[in-house]
């Protein structure tokens, strides 16, 4: 068997998921909607609203709608595959069964890229809201900003130390075996939503409809600004959508709850579409309130736009409360993605594509300490020296690749195994799966050329590792060797 045709059997992947290993079915659609909203609402709305508005103007509202629609298609595909293969590994595992080992490696490497960069991006977003706290503690601006930031004296920042600190702090907690409880998570979700409601209510009295004209000053399609070089950031509604896509991460938390859902055929659809619709509505309302209260070209220059707008409106104390809500709640997003990163490494190492030492679990804490700390270090380095925009765009490239693979996996398995029982079926899959793939491809095209190049370079490194190690050492390769 050629390495191109190595595939995992679905029955092998799901073997053992029964009896004592089956989760209790306790969730209904309200739980799933709450789970999705809690996982999705995070750095995107607190920080990327401003950056997106700088690219699209008031049209950023449309950018949120487009990004949400593409993610909804991908989410429905995730739901079908997660019930078909209720095992760790997410898109990597689905691709291994549907399209084979090389594609699975590509997807797994994309997920590693995505999760590490998401941790870094959220750390930078957290830093922007914690800036004043660190400044009050005596930290100089030089240590509160990365090299890309121009300081008041004309110089540049040295390192974003708060981002480095939060990255390593969360990694340390995970390495010790700390788990966030459901109760704490629900409280923090409530804190995030209440802060956004307060923001919208305070913006309504000063809402100015003239701020929405022109609605799309940079046009709809992603394009380079006039006179800009090929590596410059693209502008337009689609350019903002390709960045704002970051704001919808986390919906897969709903699809992974399939095994615990009482009526998955009905409730998963409601949970996924409901949470995506709720978050898209929340994002569009917050974006509209922001633009109504302050012109896009003004607040887009701030790394903490919601706080900036409230300060501009002379709501200093409320601005501090919104910033505090972000400081308290955003680390849970970092924790969730660092936890997920360790699971991707674990499954790939278990499959032999990476050294098995990487999946070693500490006997005392029950966590893969080495990989957790390595993820923390990588996140700290990236967040300490790069801008939120650059990190988020590169993270989006990895996620888009994974979403494309998930859509393709649904199509391949529907055609190859049409009669296999499915607990949840993607509605209108011949339309939804291709729509998700095409939407992701267009969003990838809308990313800056520099981001696309970095994504290619990262995968060239990954391809070398696969050829030198994974292709020969994988469990399937060893099985082939033993059988020959």
Where in the sequence are the language-model features?
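Extracellular loop-to-transmembrane helix junctions
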Residues: 23-24, 47-152, 275-278, 285, ...
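Helix-loop-helix junctions that connect adjacent transmembrane segments
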Residues: 18-23, 60-61, 65, 138-161, ...
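C-terminal membrane-solvent junction of multi-pass transporters and transport-like membrane proteins
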Residues: 155-159, 357-369, 403-452, 472-483
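Transmembrane helix-loop boundary segments of multi-pass membrane transporters
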Residues: 50-61, 111, 122-129, 138, ...
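Membrane-interface loop-to-helix entry segments
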Residues: 127, 158-212, 216, 272-276, ...
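Loop-to-transmembrane helix boundary motifs in multi-pass membrane proteins
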Residues: 24, 29, 156-164, 262-283, ...
């Amino acid at each position: 068997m050629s390495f191109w045709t190595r595939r995992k059997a679905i029955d092998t992947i799901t073997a053992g998921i029964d009896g004592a290993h089956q989760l209790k079915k306790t969730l209904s659609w309200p739980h799933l909607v709450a789970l999705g909203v809690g996982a999705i609402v995070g750095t995107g709305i607190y920080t990327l609203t401003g950056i997106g508005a700088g690219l699209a103007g008031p049209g950023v509202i449309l950018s949120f709608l487009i990004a949400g629609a593409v993610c909804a298609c991908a989410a429905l595909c995730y739901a079908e595959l997660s019930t078909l293969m209720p095992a760790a590994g997410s898109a990597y595992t689905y691709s291994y069964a549907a399209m084979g080992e090389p594609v699975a490696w590509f997807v797994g490497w994309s997920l590693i890229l995505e999760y590490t960069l998401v941790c870094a991006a959220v750390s930078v977003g957290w830093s922007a809201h914690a800036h004043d706290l660190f400044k009050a503690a005596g930290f100089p601006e030089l240590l509160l900003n990365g090299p890309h930031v121009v300081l008041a004296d004309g110089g540049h920042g040295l390192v974003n130390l708060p981002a480095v600190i939060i990255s390593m702090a969360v990694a340390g907690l995970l390495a010790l075996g700390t788990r966030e409880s459901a109760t704490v998570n629900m409280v923090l979700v409530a804190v995030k939503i209440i802060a956004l409601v307060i923001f919208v209510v305070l913006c309504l009295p000063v809402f100015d409809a003239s701020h929405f004209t022109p609605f799309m000053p940079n046009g709809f399609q992603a394009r380079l600004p006039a006179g800009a070089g090929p590596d410059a950031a693209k502008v337009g509604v689609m350019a903002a959508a390709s960045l704002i896509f970051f704001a919808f991460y986390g919906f897969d938390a709903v699809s992974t709850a399939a095994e615990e859902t009482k009526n998955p055929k009905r409730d998963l659809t409601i949970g996924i579409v409901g949470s995506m619709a709720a978050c898209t509505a929340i994002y569009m309302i917050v974006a509209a309130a922001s633009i109504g209260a302050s012109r896009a070209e003004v607040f887009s220059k701030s790394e903490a736009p919601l706080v900036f707008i409230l300060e501009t409106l002379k709501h200093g104390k409320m601005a501090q409360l919104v910033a505090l809500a972000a400081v308290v709640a955003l680390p849970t997003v970092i924790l969730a993605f660092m936890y997920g990163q360790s699971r991707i490494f674990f499954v790939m190492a278990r499959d032999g594509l990476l050294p098995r030492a990487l999946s070693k679990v500490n006997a005392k804490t029950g966590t893969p300490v080495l990989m957790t700390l390595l993820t923390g270090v990588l996140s700290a380095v990236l967040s300490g020296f790069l801008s939120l925009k650059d990190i988020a765009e590169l993270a989006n490239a990895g996620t888009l690749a994974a979403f494309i693979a998930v859509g393709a996996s649904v199509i391949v398995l529907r055609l190859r195994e049409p009669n296999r029982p499915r607990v949840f079926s993607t509605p209108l899959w011949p339309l939804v799966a291709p729509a998700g793939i095409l939407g992701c491809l267009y969003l990838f095209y809308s990313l800056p050329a520099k981001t696309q190049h970095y994504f290619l370079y990262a995968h060239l490194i990954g391809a070398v590792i696969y050829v030198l190690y994974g292709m020969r050492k994988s469990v399937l390769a060893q099985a082939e060797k033993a059988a020959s």
